[in-house]
UniProtKB/Swiss-Prot annotation:
Listed PANTHER family: PTHR46496, ZEAXANTHIN EPOXIDASE, CHLOROPLASTIC
Cofactor: FAD
Taxonomic source organism: Prunus armeniaca (Apricot)
Residue ranges constituting the FHA domain according to the UniProt record: 558-607
Source organism, top-level taxon: Eukaryota
Matching PROSITE patterns: FHA_DOMAIN
Keywords: Abscisic acid biosynthesis, Chloroplast, FAD, Flavoprotein, Oxidoreductase, Plastid, Transit peptide
Pathway(s): Plant hormone biosynthesis; abscisate biosynthesis
GO CC annotations, alphabetized: chloroplast; membrane
CDD domains xrefs: FHA_ZEP-like
Transit peptide: 1-50
GO biological process, any: abscisic acid biosynthetic process
Record's protein name: Zeaxanthin epoxidase, chloroplastic
Cell location: Plastid, Chloroplast
Length: 661
């Protein structure tokens, strides 16, 4: 006996169709297992002042004699070289850790570690790719293990580029194979706050002076004095400027040199949202004309997204207007984009203009050098900005250690300047190439055109003919050939410089057995979607109808008609409308896909995709439909939107359906 669902204009809770928002405080997204409060009694003495209070969350650091800079751990032979680091971001902390592990005295000056330097909030979680994880392993295996444990693995799934409107795959990236073949860790995504706290704890609270903003320095030849915003001075043997894209150290080295505006502003947010394909897809870049959108799994049932839009810098949104503006900008795009926007609270959306810096040949002078964004700030499209800073930190510590060993062998003073130039020379070419790749990736993502006519104004009518744009076709051929080589070099090109690290992979990083099949077969990837399929009313005559949860039992199809049919096998769905025939259509399931069969209905059955292509289903012939398609029963007035969701039916009614039309 079939179970029957009646469809009419019965009242249904408005919650089913509400656009639910989820409160997502950025600073609570990734709780850590260790205490957020760190205390220190680290003492340094200023040349001008004493007794000043500092704080790192709740860190106190009084000023004492420079000669009382904490020594290296007992397990490491101290090396009489004091290194001053301007900036306690990821690059500065990684270098400080690497230098500390080599036995050097290190002091890190950070203007506001407790706020993740502001940029951590704007830039959200950070992708630590295989090359950077390997460098962390070479620096400190325990720290690398903790980062990989706290982070969310994305490299074991499909990643790549998709069409922003249709949601279809353009190019897939294989970041798993290059890592495994070279014995590297698999790419992770981790909260910036979590990463910074892991690094700060490993560096040691006694080494970091918070609330200390380096604004200038004096290179005295064999010594360097740093000058803080409050007038205090500290002396060291060298200075590393790791103070970000707006670096004061860089400015004082080379004069004022404006950062380059990318042409894009970026909105970012985190949503409590789990896509139906979470087990098979790690991150996606949705391509469009003068705009693009990036989404990534960051673990813990959350998704991070970035929305890029071409416009002049300095724009300001109206109060509580960011989300509304984004929904207008990305109107008509696929559900993967719109659902994330709808699931994000207004207060969780942040905006910043994107800048980078053109690579320069000279990174430093004398006993001063630069590291990370202070010298090679990149656009975020490659996910390699932080990774390059980590590689910088490893290489700089290595070159200083080589100089120290040479000094010990020859009995001569450490040649600090030569070691800094050696570091700069070893990093310059690789960083410049990846910087250029990041710019090129932004250009490609925002100039993508699916069909002829896109962006052509009066000729935009050509898009209805769906003639593939030549750039799209040629670009795909090029990327298919170049991407494997590029990824292999980006992820593994620095491995030979990691002294003492043995190539190795973790069994826990094992990918799905279907990964290779998913790369080669879009259909197999779609069939792997693990979620509930729903038909959501979107027609004029059935807005108040209940949603339909489709049955994945191959032996029990759904029968749609104007009246219930208790004498058929399966679920009978009754839609008492004049356009619906008594026995109108059947929805069946087979091998991970759903099919719609018209049962010789009087008014016909149609399927329309998200791009507007509409066709009539032939009688008695099963036609496959896909997520985001619209199914019309008899006419456009009785229509349903196909949606696949990870949520159970109970939570769907509780939280509300997202985009339904």
């Amino acid at each position: 006996m079939a179970s029957t669902l009646f469809y009419n204009s019965m009242n249904l809770s408005a919650a089913v169709f509400s656009r639910t928002h989820f409160p997502i405080p950025i600073n609570k997204d990734f709780p850590l297992e260790f205490s957020p409060c760190i205390h220190t009694d680290y003492h340094l003495r200023s040349r001008t002042r004493s007794g000043q209070k500092k704080c790192l969350t709740e860190v106190r650091a009084t000023v004492a004699s420079p000669t009382e800079v904490p020594s290296a751990p007992a397990s490491t032979q101290p090396k009489k070289l004091r290194i001053l680091v301007a900036g306690g971001g990821i690059g500065g902390l990684v270098f400080a850790l690497a230098a500390k592990k080599k036995g050097f005295d290190v002091v890190v000056f950070e203007k506001d570690l407790s706020a993740v330097r502001g940029e951590g909030q704007y830039r959200g979680p950070i992708q630590i790719q295989s090359n950077a994880l390997a460098a962390l392993e070479a620096i400190d295996m325990d720290v690398a293990e903790e980062v990989m444990r706290v982070g969310c693995v994305t490299g074991d799934r499909i990643n790549g580029l998709v069409d922003g409107v249709s949601g279809t795959w353009y190019v897939k990236f294989d970041t798993f194979t290059p890592a495994v073949e070279r014995g590297l860790p698999v790419t992770r995504v981790i909260s910036r706050i979590a990463l910074q706290q892991i690094l700060a704890r490993a560096v040691g609270e006694e080494i970091i002076i918070n609330d200390s903003n380096v604004v200038n320095f004096e290179d005295l030849g064999d010594k360097v004095n740093v000058i803080l915003e409050n007038g205090q001075r500290y002396e060291g043997d060298m200075l590393v400027g790791a103070d970000g894209i707006w670096s004061k150290v860089r400015k004082n080295l080379f004069g004022l040199n404006e950062a380059v505006y990318s042409g894009y502003t970026c909105y970012t947010g985190i949503a409590d949202f789990v896509p139906a394909d979470i087990n098979s897809v790690g991150y996606r870049v949705f391509l469009g004309h003068k705009q693009y959108f990036v989404s990534s799994d960051v673990g813990g049932g959350k998704m991070q997204w970035y929305a890029f839009h071409k416009e002049s810098p300095g724009g300001v949104d109206s109060p509580n207007g960011k989300k509304e503006r984004l929904l207008k900008i990305f109107e008509g795009w696929c559900d993967n984009v719109i659902d994330l926007l709808l699931a994000t609270e207004e207060d969780a959306i942040l905006r910043r203009d994107i800048y980078d810096r053109t690579p320069i040949l000279t990174w430093g002078k004398g006993h001063v050098t630069l590291l990370g964004d202070s010298v090679h700030a990149m656009q975020p499209n490659m996910g390699q900005g932080g990774c390059m800073a980590i590689e910088d930190g490893y290489q700089l510590a290595l070159e200083l250690d080589k100089a120290w060993k040479k000094s010990s062998e020859t009995g001569t003073p450490v040649d600090v300047a030569s070691s800094l130039r050696s570091y700069e020379n070893s990093r310059r070419l690789r960083v410049a190439i990846i910087h250029g790749m990041a710019r090129m990736a932004a250009l490609m993502a925002s100039t993508y055109k699916a069909y002829l006519g896109v962006g052509l104004g009066p000729l935009s009518f050509l898009t209805k003919f769906r003639i593939p744009h030549p750039g799209r076709v040629g670009g795909r051929v090029f990327i298919d050939k170049a991407m494997p080589l590029m990824l292999s070099w980006v992820l593994g090109g620095n491995s030979s410089k990691l002294e003492g690290r043995s190539p190795s992979c973790r069994l826990s990083d094992k990918a799905s057995d279907q990964l290779r099949n998913w790369f080669e077969d879009d259909d197999a990837l779609e069939r792997a979607i693990d979620g509930e399929w729903y038909l959501i009313p979107c027609g004029q005559d059935n807005d108040a109808s209940q949603l339909i949860c489709l049955n994945r039992d191959e032996k029990n199809p759904c029968i749609i008609g104007s009246a219930p049919h208790g004498d058929v096998s399966g679920i009978s769905i009754a839609i008492p409308k004049p356009q619906v025939s008594e026995m109108h259509a059947r929805i069946s399931y087979k091998d991970g896909a759903f099919y719609l069969t018209d049962l010789r209905s009087e008014h016909g059955t149609w399927i329309a995709d998200i791009e507007g292509k509409r066709y009539r289903v032939p009688p008695n012939f099963p036609a496959r439909f896909r997520p985001s398609d619209a199914i019309e029963i008899g006419s456009q007035k009785v229509a349903f939107r196909v949606k696949v969701m990870k949520s159970s039916p109970g939570s769907v009614e509780k939280e509300g359906i997202l985009q339904a039309a």
